[in-house]
Design a protein with these regions (language model features):
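Glycine-rich portal/gate segments that line the openings of hydrophobic small-molecule binding cavities
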Residues: 28-31, 37-79, 83, 127-140
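Residue-level detector of alpha-helix boundaries and kinks
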Residues: 2, 12, 73, 113-117
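Beta-strand secondary-structure signal
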Residues: 5-7, 49-51, 72, 85-87, ...
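Hydrophobic ligand-binding cavity/cleft-lining segments
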Residues: 1-43
Length: 140
């Protein structure tokens, strides 16, 4: 298991950043380097199942609203399964976005686990945190 955390101050209200992230219709625009499109398959209470047209092919993501400041995303891919905890903590008129990942590599990729954490951190920052921050801050 690889555990990684990236935290960033965002100059936008927490509810704006959450709304961007929570809506899969935004994902292709927010995360164009990795996502071509996304469609909601079903909603049940606080859970949304999303089919994502990812650069690696079609994958399933499950979004769960855990609390007013937290959204979890479970992702199933060919090389790994991962849980991402997204925390949106207000800081005055801005917020702190913290993304925590728990990544379970599949065989044979599991053998590389001791060397993969820096790559996981870099991709979290480049493909999720930075694009989400840029989109939220540009909506002023």
């Amino acid at each position: 298991m690889i555990d990684a955390v990236v935290s960033e101050h965002v100059n936008a209200p927490a509810d704006r950043v959450q709304a961007l992230y929570r809506n899969p219709d935004n994902w292709a625009r927010l995360f164009p380097a990795t996502i071509r499109g996304a469609r909601v398959v079903r909603r049940e209470g606080d859970t949304t199942v999303v089919e994502v047209d990812h650069v690696e092919g079609k994958v399933v993501n499950i979004l769960r609203d855990i609390s007013p400041t937290r959204i979890d995303l479970v992702e199933f891919k060919r090389r790994y399964d991962a849980t991402f905890v997204n925390e949106f903590i207000p800081e005055g008129e801005a917020m702190r976005y913290t993304l925590t990942a728990s990544v379970r590599l599949k065989w044979p990729y599991r053998l590389a686990a001791p060397f993969v954490k820096p790559l996981v951190l870099a991709r979290m920052r480049r493909y999720v945190v930075e694009p989400l921050k840029a989109a939220a801050e540009s909506q002023r």
